[in-house]
Amino acid sequence: MEEANGVLSMGRIASGLIAAALVGCVAAARTETVKGELVDQACYIKDKKNVGGSHKDCAETCARRGQPLAVVTAGGKIYQITGPLAADNNTKLIPHLAHTVEITGDVSEKDGALMIAAEAGSLKMVGR
């Protein structure tokens, strides 16, 4: 019986170590306000010229299909928008495509990619 408990304890220890390692892959979220242009993330990553009014129709089509949208800062950082603000195929974000916005939310990083999880009321348009 003691040996069975020892195996069970080792299993619990191993499970705990695995869980801790997985948590370490995602940096802890911190609340920030991010300012930049609202873009269709996939198109922007393919070609940095896919911004502004000339790309707005394409970005809107992709956004309505549920493609991730992102804020691109003046320094070139890309923050994928997640959470309630991006719900319902980006409904709350679409009117602001190709505009400069500020979004406040929980910023995290996973495998080098930045994400901002934001509530529906956390977006502010600051420029066209």
Stretch-by-stretch model annotation:
Residues A14-G24:
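Bacterial N-terminal signal peptides
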Residues M1-M10:
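N-terminal secretory signal peptides that target proteins for export/translocation
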Residues A28-R128:
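OB-fold and OB-like single-stranded nucleic-acid-recognition modules
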Residues G6, L22-C25, L38:
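Detector for intrinsically disordered, low-structure N-terminal pre-sequences
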